[in-house]
Amino acid sequence: MLTTIRSIQKNDNSPLAKIVRQVMEEFGVNLPNTVYTDPTTDHLFELFQKDRAVYNVAEVDGKIVGGGGIYPTDGLPDGVCELVKMWLLPEARGLGLGRTMIEKCLQQAKELGFNKVYLESMPELKQALRIYEKFGFEYLNAQMGNSGHTGCQKWMIKVL
């Protein structure tokens, strides 16, 4: 089994949008005001052309199984980026890909000059929240920035 992580390409838009929505449905978090209904979910390649934004695609044996990135979300304080759209299909879990993706994103955030990484999640995503805690993310009492994803009820931040 060959696992790879690479930069997003334009032809990844459709498979990645399907993965995001499939995983959200799996956990019952396919709700309004989340990435599930966000129109940018269908155009990730274009979204991540923004300066200081990076999106990584995870593959197993050449098949796209997920992705995740960092993004300079509007309204975040200077030096803070957001860990965004981190999703893996069920068959990709337990392979260490999630951990590798987060490590890569944190390293990319540092290289791009960020000193903190913020994220938004949901209580239903218990396994993801535990992984973020292991990486040193700490819970916040309120949302930061203007992601527009008011359907998320868990907010975390990590100092790099």
PLM region spans:
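C-terminal "cap" of GNAT-fold acetyltransferases
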Residues: 2, 22, 115-118, 122-160
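Acetyl-CoA-dependent GNAT
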Residues: 3, 7-91, 102-104, 108, ...
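Residues that form or flank phosphate/diphosphate-binding pockets in enzymes
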Residues: 78, 96, 127
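Short coil/turn segments at alpha/beta junctions that flank glycine-rich nucleotide-binding fingerprints
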Residues: 95, 111-115
